[in-house]
From Swiss-Prot:
Residue spans of biased composition, Polar residues class: 350-365, 377-388
Gene name per UniProt: p2xE
Highest taxon in the source lineage: Eukaryota
Region described as Pore-forming motif: spans on this chain: 291-304
Subcellular locations according to the entry: Contractile vacuole membrane
Gene Ontology biological process: calcium ion transmembrane transport; cellular hypotonic response; monoatomic ion transport; regulation of calcium-mediated signaling
UniProt keyword list: Ion channel, Ion transport, Ligand-gated ion channel, Membrane, Receptor, Transmembrane, Transmembrane helix, Transport, Vacuole
Lumenal side: 50-312
Family note: Belongs to the P2X receptor family.
Taxonomic lineage: Eukaryota, Amoebozoa, Evosea, Eumycetozoa, Dictyostelia
Inactivation phenotype: Response to extracellular ATP remains the same in p2xE null strains. Null cells are still capable of osmoregulation and do not show any noticeable differences in their sensitivity to hypotonic conditions. Quintuple p2xA/p2xB/p2xC/p2xD/p2xE null cells displayed slight delay in their osmoregulatory response, but are still capable of regulating their cell volume in water. Extracellular purinergic response to ATP persists in the quintuple null cells with no alteration in the kinetics of the response, but the magnitude of the response is lower.
Cytoplasmic topology ranges: 1-28, 334-388
Protein name, as recorded: P2X receptor E
Example of a GO MF term: intracellularly ATP-gated calcium channel activity
Pfam families, alphabetized: P2X_receptor (PF00864)
Length: 388
């Protein structure tokens, strides 16, 4: 191979940018429209609407719940079986009722992010057969008595909700009682409940009755048709509800306004029960509480934001990249689609070479690094002038 015959200048050619001003109103208006659109997108879309100048963090937190029984205990409850009369209510069989307090209704007594409220219980008394010892493989329990009953007036039990939020990277930490809040219905619209329900009042803990929770979840009452078994009521079968606590300080342009919302969602085609064993004097004797009821799971979510200059700068830089794309589109239209595309290509793309000994242009068509003007008509290349 003869290396002297290789055109090293062509092999290692360098492409640089050449600026040509095309005096064509069609291309100018198109490019100007692109620029206006990009500016509106950056300023209005990303800055004002999407708030892309904020650095965001999903909050974490804790939830504490407690239950309280109502002070008034009504005796004329329609779902309670009384002396063999009123054996059904709304087409579903009635059961005897017991008046439990909050310590019996709530099981387990304390949970981190959920709670279970008993609405029906089957209580069984069991002992080992003939007092046998559980070390024997044939020893089993025998049920000596059983009763099935509803918990009276359980829908009027009240729930206290105490929650905290924290965004460690942003240095944000609050208790729910320090913030304004709001209750949303299943469609995300604000709703309010009558007393004793208190939700979103700054300086006061949130208190909701079980009936208030059901209403917010779209359930008319515990005596509505069950979700998993249509022959039973929700009071009889149990139910599962998700409570989303959503935090935000980006709903306005003032990030100092913190706000939270409650939204209860019903999990379809579900029921809920917990079996609680209670041992008495030894493991050979026990009570079994087969509890059905309302299970509420609390989920903390949302986004908190703070102004961050680097985030805003990155948003601007990303938007400026669209300017290059707009110029590329206009260039393609000018050099590939316009009637004068041949002349536009000639002005835009120029192939020049300068040898190492004689630093003079070798291109016979257009002098290098020298301004030139051409007049081009839209059809005959005579009207529009171009400057390099």
């Amino acid at each position: 191979m003869n290396f002297r015959n290789i055109d090293w200048d062509s092999l290692f050619s360098y492409s640089t940018i050449k600026i040509v001003r095309i005096r064509d109103k069609r291309l100018g208006i198109l490019h100007f429209a692109f620029l206006i659109g990009i500016i509106l997108y950056i300023i209005v879309g990303t800055i004002f609407l999407q708030k892309k100048y904020l650095v965001l963090e999903s909050p974490i937190g804790s939830i504490r719940t407690s239950l309280m029984a109502p002070s008034v205990k009504p005796t004329d409850l329609p779902y309670c079986l009384k002396n063999g009369t009123d054996t059904s209510y709304d087409g579903y069989p009635n059961k005897p009722c017991q008046y439990w307090d909050e310590y019996l209704v709530l099981y387990p007594p304390s949970e981190e992010s959920s709670m279970f409220i008993t609405t029906r219980c089957t209580q069984e008394t069991q002992s080992t057969v003939n007092g046998c010892n559980l070390s024997e493989p044939t020893c089993v329990y025998n049920t000596t008595s059983s009763s099935d009953f509803y918990i009276a007036n359980v829908e009027n039990f009240t729930i206290l909700l105490d929650h905290t939020l924290s965004a460690p990277s942003l240095g944000i930490q609050y208790n729910g009682a320090q913030l304004n809040g709001q209750l949303l219905d299943t469609d995300g619209n604000p709703m309010s409940l009558p007393p004793p329900n208190i939700v979103g009042v700054k300086g006061s803990p949130d208190i909701m009755s079980l009936q208030g929770v059901l209403t917010a979840a779209g359930v008319e009452s515990l005596d509505s048709q069950g979700l998993a078994n249509k022959s039973r009521t929700i009071r009889d079968d149990g139910i599962l509800i998700l409570c989303f606590i959503t935090y935000s300080n980006t709903y306005t342009y003032n990030t100092g306004n913190y706000h939270y919302t409650y939204q209860f969602k019903l999990v379809q085609n579900t029921k809920y029960k917990i079996v609680e064993p209670v041992f008495t004097k030894d493991v050979e004797d026990r009570y079994i509480f087969d509890r059905h009821g309302v299970r509420i799971i609390f989920i903390q979510t949302g986004q908190l934001g703070q102004f961050d200059f680097q985030t805003m700068l990155l948003t601007f830089v990303s938007g400026i990249g669209l300017v290059t794309a707009a110029s590329l589109i206009v260039d393609i239209i000018a050099t590939r689609i316009m009637p004068q595309r041949s002349r536009y290509q000639e002005l835009k793309f120029q192939d020049s070479s300068i040898n190492n000994t004689q630093k003079t242009p070798t291109n016979d068509h257009t002098p290098l690094l020298k301004d030139n003007e051409d007049t081009i008509n839209e059809n005959s290349y005579q009207n529009n002038s171009y400057e390099k």
